[in-house]
Amino acid sequence: VKFTSEKDISLLELVKAKMGFVSNTKARNVIKIGQIMVSGKVIKIPSTLIKPGTEVELARRVKSKRVLKEEPILKHKILFEDENILAVDKRTGLIVKSSNGNLRTLFTDVNYYLKGKGVDTCLMVNKVDKKESGIVVFAKELSIYKELSDNWKKYTKRHYIVIPGGMVDEKGNLADTFHENDIGLLLPGKGKKTMEVSLDYRVMKSNGQFTVIRIEEISSHKNQIRAMFSLLKNPILGDDKYRSEYKYEKGMAAHFFSIKFPYNDYELEIKTPIPKPFLKLAR
């Protein structure tokens, strides 16, 4: 992929416009990992000024020179891996990514693992909160990253949660209007950032005191599941941000267990079982 600029413009703005990225963050990530070449040289500074007529291109994926003699080991459960994608099961309590380069994160672990296999590109497609667990997908190719991240909201995503008490019905749909406040909390009703939230649910196991619920996202908004169950006066165990009165020793009883999307002419589903601690609570 090659393109040129018609005017003075930052590399970030040019890459975002020419490659169709929907956010600055995604375009910035691509530049910082060395996927963009300017006049034949890799440039990793998003603010670099590009003059009219300067040739910019997508760098070809190359094998890393640093290949471990022994097969690298990733200390996270690998759910799926091929030449383009790696999906792992993140444990509760681990940060997925940080600007602090000295901090161990899921990203640093996966990046080291991939470099050990000779893969230089490591792009994280989705995030899972530190207090939660579940599937995190990484792309080994820029084109795959862009395809997955641009369409993420359209894909079928399912979660397991544990709430105190139970539900009136064994299955159904939960729908309501929320708005995002100035500190990122979703609150009931309309506001500056209004959104419609819709979730399908099914009770998987319950003992009256605690209930394991499977959630399928119909809408796709950050923290929508947490906000919905807070509205129902049954916030997820350990979710102090949304007023849970119950502690959960591992963090929060929320697990992203399934993602399904079109891939290589078939429907790929990456999934995990119900976490054993969830079942133990509701037995």
Residue ranges and their predicted role:
Residues V1-R283:
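RNA pseudouridine synthases
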